[in-house]
Amino acid sequence: MQKLFRTIPAIDKLMKKPQGIDLIERFGHQAFVQEARILIENAREQIIKQQCLPAFMNEQSSIFSLIEQNLQKKRMVSSKTVFNLTGTVLHTNLGRGLWSENAITAATNAMRNNVALEFDIDEGKRSHRDIYISQLIQQLTGAEAACIVNNNAAAVLLMLATFAQGKEVIVSRGELVEIGGAFRIPDIMAQAGCKLVEVGTTNRTHLRDYRNAINENTAFLMKVHTSNYHIQGFTKSVSEEELVELAKEFDLPVISDLGSGSLTDMAVLGLPAEPMVQQKVAAGVDLVSFSCDKLLGGPQAGIIVGKKALIDGLQSHPLKRVLRCDKVILSALEATLRHYLFPEKLTDEVPTFQLLTQSIETLQNKAERLKAVLNKRLDSRYILQVEPSLAQIGSGSLPTETLASVAVTVFAEKQSDLLELEKRFKALPSPIIGRFAQQKFWLDVRSAAQFEQLLNMLEEA
């Protein structure tokens, strides 16, 4: 055993070898020594437990190769790019939508340079970081002012904490939503220090229910867009317009959590209709909050629009600093919003709309091409077909609506073969994520961004 221990090289000797000098030059002295120590310690442990040297100690070149390999792994980012073929275009677990080229350019420019984030160049003095985008949002929505935070949940929390702490907020029982990650409206209210007052029933809420619940401790009336579920049948709800008229009688504000939010008429694009921010503002709602990384097609952020006096209150609350966005997100968001100044070009420039508005003919062609490539790579255990599919927008947007789509389906007699195929897809340089349904593995091409890159990867695999 002592003889084996003597074969373990000293770290200082490894450092003086040409390979060691090269690795230190590339990765630094500290990182090289740390990795070498780990390997040497592993070698010692193996000698004690198994009375033999590990394979990498048989040749000195092997230990240098392993050190290099491990150091390279440390440089790799853990979040992998993937190909989304689930059929869910805005898949929350896969990062939702892609940014437009303009947004990417704006974000990259902000990363590489100083920007006038909170500085008025003309006046030569400090400014507010939301001001430039706020003016753009006002133009797009018709609102008096805007406030930007890091997501819509933060927007809801800020509104509640600013105006309802220690007070009551009235919400319809049918609108007490829970979204992914166990985000619940009642929990957010508790966190903000306000009391939830539920009115109506799960399926029916009347204007009188709100009226009967109003008292001297009421902070405001709240509407929550149930973006991830839909109640059908014997139902009744109260519109924003009705709530606004009621609130005026008691000098109370109305706030609306619009969730996914949309700044364009989806029906014009041939897609299912979704409530627009502009409509809520026009209805007289005092504050409207919505997400930026869902139907808007931008980075993760939350926007609150509404009456200037209320927005000023949000901007001055201590939580606003906690929840604010950085220069990169603000730059990408502004670039995304500027696309909406040219609505007829949205489907050409915003990836979310590019994917959602693809024709069936385009999808059929993509599916046939994908099938042809896969047929070359898969053996006779797998039967491939191009079939009609139903895709969805995702991220809690229009939960009951589906989009006609096309998919490549893979069938195998043995379920274990399909599981093996899924494992192979996940082991690719950029994993392919599909879905199981009807005893087949589905690869829905509507949600597949970077389609040519997908085919190239499969050709080379």
From Swiss-Prot:
Write out the GO biological process terms.
conversion of seryl-tRNAsec to selenocys-tRNAsec; selenocysteine incorporation
Q: Which reaction does it catalyse?
A: L-seryl-tRNA(Sec) + selenophosphate + H(+) = L-selenocysteinyl-tRNA(Sec) + phosphate
Record keyword NADP present: no
Which keywords does this Swiss-Prot/TrEMBL entry list? Cytoplasm, Protein biosynthesis, Pyridoxal phosphate, Selenium, Transferase
- Return the GO cellular component terms, semicolon-separated: cytoplasm
InterPro entries attached to this UniProt entry: PyrdxlP-dep_Trfase, PyrdxlP-dep_Trfase_major, SelA-like, SelA_trans, SelA_trans_N_dom
**Which cofactors?**
pyridoxal 5'-phosphate
Query: What biological function has been recorded for the protein in this entry?
Result: Converts seryl-tRNA(Sec) to selenocysteinyl-tRNA(Sec) required for selenoprotein biosynthesis.
The pathway that the record names for this protein is: Aminoacyl-tRNA biosynthesis; selenocysteinyl-tRNA(Sec) biosynthesis; selenocysteinyl-tRNA(Sec) from L-seryl-tRNA(Sec) (bacterial route): step 1/1
Q: What is its EC number?
A: 2.9.1.1
Question: May I ask which residue range the UniProt record assigns to the signal sequence?
Answer: none
Record's protein name? L-seryl-tRNA(Sec) selenium transferase
Subcellular localization, per the record?
Cytoplasm
Q: Which family does it belong to?
A: Belongs to the SelA family.
Modification N6-(pyridoxal phosphate)lysine, positions: 294
GO terms of molecular function: L-seryl-tRNA(Sec) selenium transferase activity
Keyword Transferase on this protein?
yes
